[in-house]
């Protein structure tokens, strides 16, 4: 089973991954692999300190204080290790339930697999076209951290809000 979505009534942009990696499942939260660049990148984009790897509340705070939401495209699947290429038996998450609770205006997919799954299973339900962003996974090491910050920052610039919490 996937993790619960992180969102509030102030979440206007949804960031979607594919499925939690083994390290994320071990940590019981999104992007738990120590080499994943997601949390350092989001901290840089929001002006927040980089949260400690095990500080789930600080990570949730980065998302919630800045008008974002975080979830995965899949509720369940069969996967070998952390290889997105091995994903089969997919069950997509119920995006309609999230959209009924949060005023999501934009969807951003963390990597090509999340984008492909979103487009196939979730776009017909949401009606919101997604933006495919380069994966923050350590498997995408060819994409430098500076490039990730630049591309993600440009995509999210109109959606990252100033904290009022």
Per-range role (PLM):
Residues 23-86:
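Short, surface-exposed acidic-centric catalytic microdomains
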Residues 50-51, 116, 122:
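Short polar/charged helix/loop
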């Amino acid at each position: 089973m996937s993790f619960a979505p992180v969102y509030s009534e102030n979440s206007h942009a949804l960031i979607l991954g594919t499925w939690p990696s083994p390290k994320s499942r071990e940590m019981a939260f999104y992007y738990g692999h120590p080499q994943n660049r997601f949390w350092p990148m989001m901290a840089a984009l929001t002006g927040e300190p980089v949260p400690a790897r095990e500080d789930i509340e600080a990570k949730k705070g980065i998302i919630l204080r800045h008008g974002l939401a975080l979830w995965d495209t899949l509720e369940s699947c069969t996967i070998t290790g952390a290889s997105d290429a091995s994903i089969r038996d997919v069950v997509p998450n119920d995006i309609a339930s999230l959209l009924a609770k949060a005023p999501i205006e934009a969807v951003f997919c963390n990597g090509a697999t999340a984008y492909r799954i979103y487009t196939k299973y979730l776009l017909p339900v949401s009606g919101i076209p997604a933006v495919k962003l380069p994966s923050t996974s350590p498997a995408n090491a060819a994409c430098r951290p500076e490039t990730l910050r630049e591309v993600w920052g440009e995509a999210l610039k109109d959606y990252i809000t100033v904290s009022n919490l």
